[in-house]
A protein has these predicted regions:
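Membrane-interfacial amphipathic/re-entrant helices at transmembrane-helix boundaries
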Residues: 1-22
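C-terminal binding/interaction regions
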Residues: 2-6, 114-122, 222-259
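Transmembrane helix-bundle core of multi-pass membrane transporters
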Residues: 11-12, 87-148
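Loop-to-transmembrane alpha-helix initiation sites
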Residues: 14-17, 61-68, 85-89, 133, ...
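Short loop segments and helix-boundary regions at transmembrane helix junctions
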Residues: 27-109, 205-217, 234-237, 260-262
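Small-residue-rich segments of transmembrane alpha-helices in multi-pass membrane proteins
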Residues: 45-57, 91-103, 123-124, 167-179, ...
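Membrane-helix/interface signature in polytopic inner-membrane proteins
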Residues: 141-174
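Transmembrane alpha-helical segments in multi-pass inner-membrane proteins
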Residues: 194-243
Length: 262
């Protein structure tokens, strides 16, 4: 594993893009798991992939087109009064069908559809870095504001109703934040890699952490460390980044959870 490739000027921008997303997505995934909406990560990613592909078909970069589909899903979920993972399962099906149909009926071909699923991190440029940085700032600024309300809503579900609190704005705000995070993640590191970062580190953190602060640090730490290892491995072995990241996340966190359980 050649760590020098990480600081190579050719891969510096792609590395920074992925590094930001590797810290952001696990933080969003923590709250999705807390709300029992972990499938949201995959549903929003699929909608983002579909709208990103549609954007490419009309000449719009995927990283700009992807948020439109994810935001549409977040709005539909918020104002459609849907609860649980059912709506996100429908998003997966809709996004998958749209992606395959657009890929099959456009000049882009199925290769671009597969590229969106697997990720095109190595080709990330300034526009991708700017999008990732914006999402990173929104998460750093927004989560401390949204988190207390979201946690209280989960632990004390009757508090909002009994106190006549209009908490829908906080839930909708987080839905939008999660949609943006998954959209930029899907448009840069790939659909399945983005889902893995939002799902696997929080799963492990919930199993081994002592409190919420500990959970936050563990999930973000797992995401960042696994990303750095996967990035170096993928470049050194000339392998696609997305599958390598998923493999590193699953193997490392699975082993850590098993060791901790014993």
């Amino acid at each position: 594993m050649n760590l020098e490739l990480i600081v190579d000027p050719l891969f510096r921008t792609p590395f920074l893009v992925g590094l930001i997303m590797s810290a952001v997505l696990p933080l969003l995934g923590n709250l999705l798991r807390l709300r029992d909406e972990w499938l949201a990560a995959l549903g929003l990613a699929y909608l983002a992939g579909a709208s990103g592909l549609i954007g490419l078909a009309v000449g719009i970069p995927a990283v700009l087109g992807a948020p439109l589909g994810a935001l549409a899903g977040a709005i539909a979920k918020a104002f459609g009064q849907f609860r649980g993972n059912t709506v996100y399962a429908m998003m997966v099906l809709i996004g998958w069908a749209a992606t395959m149909l657009v890929a099959a009926n456009s000049v882009l071909g199925s290769a671009v559809g597969h590229a969106l699923v697997e990720g095109q991190l190595y080709f990330a440029g300034t526009i991708h870095l700017a999008a990732a940085a914006v999402v990173g700032v929104l998460v750093v600024v927004g989560l401390p504001v949204l988190m207390p309300t979201l946690i209280r809503s989960r632990l004390l579900p009757g508090h909002e109703v009994s106190n006549r609190l209009k908490a829908w704005r906080w839930h909708f705000g987080f839905d939008v934040l999660a949609a943006l995070g998954m959209a930029i993640g899907a448009g840069t590191i790939g659909l399945m890699a983005a889902f893995a970062l939002a799902f696997v580190p929080p799963w492990a953190a919930f199993r081994i952490s002592r409190n919420w602060r500990h959970c936050t640090l563990i999930s973000a730490g797992i995401g960042v460390v696994a990303y750095i290892i996967a990035f170096a491995l993928a470049l050194s072995l000339d392998q696609p980044f997305g599958p390598v990241l998923v493999a590193v996340l699953v193997v490392s966190t699975g082993a850590a959870v098993m060791i901790r359980s014993y």
